[in-house]
Amino acid sequence: MTGSNMSECLADAMCQRCQARFAPTERIVNSNGELYHEHCFVCAQCFRPFPEGLFYEFEGRKYCEHDFQMLFAPCCGFCGEFVIGRVIKAMNANWHPGCFRCELCDVELADLGFVKNAGRHLCRPCHNREKAKGLGKFICQRCHLAIDEQPLMFKNDPYHPDHFSCSNCGKELTSDARELKGELYCLPCHDKMGIPICGACRRPIEGRVVNALGKQWHVEHFVCAKCEKPFLGHRHYEKKGLAYCETHYNQLFGDVCYNCSHVIEGDVVSALSKAWCVNCFSCSTCNMKLTLKNKFVEFDMKPVCKRCYERFPLELKKRLKKLSDLSSRKAQPKSVDVNSL
């Protein structure tokens, strides 16, 4: 299509939302063949632009992620949060794939299948073990015969010990064998290999050990990523796999006000999982200043005072009540039960 033909087509085109035509020089949003004015391409619920252009469509209307969750998404039977994307339906509930796990070994069940066992959802190995316990014996997962003596547990499964040899010395194993990085060792060999290695200098740690960031450290080698001073037992703060002292953590990652987007100087109001300047924390409807002592409800990720909340439609209050109940499970500071308003 030539430039002149395209101009003629756009001259006759109309915005999908307001049905008005487009100015010759204005920017046009094309969403799956539908054309919009830039200011018309907004969430059908909160009328705000879609963050990073991400939206969810339901019955011909487009919603931002937050409003789609609040209006339509099912709630996970484990974590209580909204499920977006793949939903696992099992045990008369909805689940995130990562939340539907064996109740004994915690392995994900979404792609493995599960077995109901006494009202629990279990993976097949755990189900088999529970069934064997009912018989009073373990079942060897290699030869599938009953284990009369103490079993050797390897990767959470029981075995006859004489099925295995030590990965280091080659001796036949007994039930007191130990697993290390997927290999089995007799107890003497394992004890020789169990010395922790420092995450900084990569040398063995023979004295006190600091466990942090998923590694082990010499006390003097566990330091602030900025000033490199040892913490020596003092509090540290973690960010993207690095540890910082309090001073440099605040300098590098200070709280930013959700309302004005400025770094907060002075007191910080922590509410609704966000940080606010004291002067910016107010009712999003009537602009009345709020404190954490006031009763308020979260709506569109902002606080709404008690007086404005009471004017909301009944159906909206029901949705907010459900959202409040889910939030209270996470023990968020100053969350308000809408039943008390």
Swiss-Prot record:
SUPFAM superfamilies: Glucocorticoid receptor-like (DNA-binding domain) (SSF57716). Residues 13-74, 76-133, 138-195, 196-255, 256-315 form the LIM zinc-binding domain. GO terms for cellular component: focal adhesion; plasma membrane. Keywords: Cell junction, Cell membrane, LIM domain, Membrane, Metal-binding, Phosphoprotein, Repeat, Zinc. Its main location: other. Detected in heart, lung, kidney, liver, urinary bladder, fat, skin, skeletal muscle, uterus, large intestine and testis. The keyword Ion transport does not apply. This is LIM and senescent cell antigen-like-containing domain protein 2. It comes from Mus musculus (Mouse).
